[in-house]
């Protein structure tokens, strides 16, 4: 992969929103995300962990409001809002992985292998499994 492909032009002024290179895999995303990680290096690991916790809380809060305010119905606007918060979580996960010297693809593959092993052993059921069949999802 050519690191030149990963350059960001966040200061570009044009008719479109800020320009960026679209990513096609997790490691490329991680490299691009790292370019926007602006926090003191002595806060590595701590800063992204706290940020991830906050963003995950925002995801949970939006889902809570679906239950409380929207009669368990998810509309396209809520999908976009939740997706944006998940994107923020992904950024924090990405820079946290980078801070500890891990590639996102390695983490993802190790997790999939762990899940496949659990499935094979018949232990892929977890405790306190929740069913979301009562939610009404938007149709595309």
Regions found by a protein language model. Give the residues of each.
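Short, C-terminally biased terminal segments at protein or domain edges
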Residues: 105, 110-113, 117-132
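An amphipathic alpha-helical micro-motif enriched in hydrophobic residues
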Residues: 50-59, 78-108
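Extended low-complexity intrinsically disordered regions
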Residues: 1-67
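Acidic interhelical loop/turn segments
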Residues: 64-80
């Amino acid at each position: 992969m050519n690191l030149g492909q990963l350059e960001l032009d966040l200061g570009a002024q044009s008719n479109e929103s800020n320009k960026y290179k679209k990513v096609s895999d997790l490691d490329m995303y991680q490299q691009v995300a790292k370019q926007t990680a602006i926090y003191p290096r002595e806060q590595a690991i701590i800063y992204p962990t706290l940020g991830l916790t906050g963003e995950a809380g925002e995801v949970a809060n939006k889902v809570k409001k679906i239950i409380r305010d929207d009669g368990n119905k998810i509309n396209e606007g809520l999908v976009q809002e939740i997706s944006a918060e998940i994107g923020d979580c992904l950024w924090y996960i990405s820079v946290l992985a980078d801070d500890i010297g891990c590639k996102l693809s390695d983490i993802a593959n190790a997790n999939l292998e762990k899940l496949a092993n659990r499935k094979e052993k018949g232990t892929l059921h977890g405790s306190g499994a929740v069913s979301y069949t009562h939610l009404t999802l938007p149709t595309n």
